[in-house]
Amino acid sequence: MMHKSNLIEDNKRGENQSFLYFLHEEKKFDVKALDDLCHYIIELDTISLEQLRDIHYIENQILRHLVYHFDDNDLSKISNLPFEYWEYIEPFERLVASLYEGEVKEE
């Protein structure tokens, strides 16, 4: 995978076909974009405090979109949310938790 762009920054801004772009702008759950973000984070040599804050923001936005999707009073619905969506979200959450703990990340 080429790292032409900063996927953390792209997701934070919801730009460049990032996972949060698809989730927020197109109301789509893009499995590949989420996988790309995870691999991008795993491949980083170091993570700055600013990047960690951005990843925390991304994680919160993902959870908010899921809450909105399941809220009967909210019109925002993810058009293609997989039935087993948690199987895709959980690896990202484990990765983020490992960053908080300062653990070595593995694929």
Language model regions located:
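Short, solvent-exposed segments of well-ordered alpha helices
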Residues: 25-35, 49, 53, 76-79, ...
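Functionally constrained cores in energy, signaling, and assembly domains
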Residues: 4-5, 11-12, 44, 69, ...
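Residue-level detector of well-ordered alpha-helical segments, enriched
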Residues: 3, 33, 51-54, 58, ...
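Short terminal alpha-helical segments
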Residues: 1-38
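Short hydrophobic interaction/assembly module
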Residues: 45-70
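Amphipathic alpha-helical binding modules
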Residues: 61-107
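Short secondary-structure junctions and interdomain/linker hinges
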Residues: 14, 18, 44, 48, ...
